[in-house]
Amino acid sequence: MILPNIETFIGCESSFEEASIVLYGAPFDSTTSFRPGARFGPSAMRHESFGLETYSPYQDKDLMDISVFDSGDLELCFGSSEMALSDIEKRAEEILGAGKFPLLLGGEHLVTLAAVRAVAAKYPNLHIIHFDAHADLRDDYLGAKLSHACVLRRCHEIVGDGHIHQFCIRSGEREEFQFASRHTDFHPFTFEGLEETIRELKEKQVPVYFTIDLDCLDPSVFPGTGTPEAGGVSFLELLKAIRTVSQTNVVGADVNELAPMLDASGVSTATACKVLRELLLAIAK
């Protein structure tokens, strides 16, 4: 049984039974390779969301007009990636089993793997749309196969060649870029090519998992993240891209890599909250 959370994201106050979208938080950052703190992202987004309006002038939609249940954060074992991923996957399976849309709040990007496992088990021929500063395609990081630096490589092992569509990538090892050129639909640096990719996915009528690493944003907009990379996209470019992706059959999604304590101004958390609001409104049917 999934119980209501004490503190919810603004406007996400529906019951589990009546909701079409379910938020679930994964406060995990144990494989962070540079600056930790993403485990505090989900709770910070909830707390600071009350500085937002529920209404989006970008989409002329309001969170009060859609049904979202916030199930809160999972209790995860910080010392075991396998155990944490298993718990996240079970929660995603429970949400999917009830016919709801699972929207995961990270946490570091490794948590996406658990959600993809659950969603791919329900939706064959799954495609993944990936916004990020980093390719995340290493086969291992310092010998670890389960790392935020390897998450899309592990996802590739699930969905296969041509099923991962990557945008905004501007950092990684040479081998990652070479792997991407052979095995993924790779669009470095910007969102160029996104509209064509979306047209193709709509024509194929395939299910899509949508993962947003917030470090796709430029650090001038979003400095509060574990591995900031100069040369990112703007906030408005990201919002336009989210609305474009929402035209496909999105069956699961996540927003990850906010490390709120790394930005004392609070701007990064405010930005993450606004991204989540826009994503919720874009995917709500």
Placement of each model-derived feature along the sequence:
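Conserved alpha-helical scaffold segments that buttress catalytic/binding sites
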Residues: I2-K285
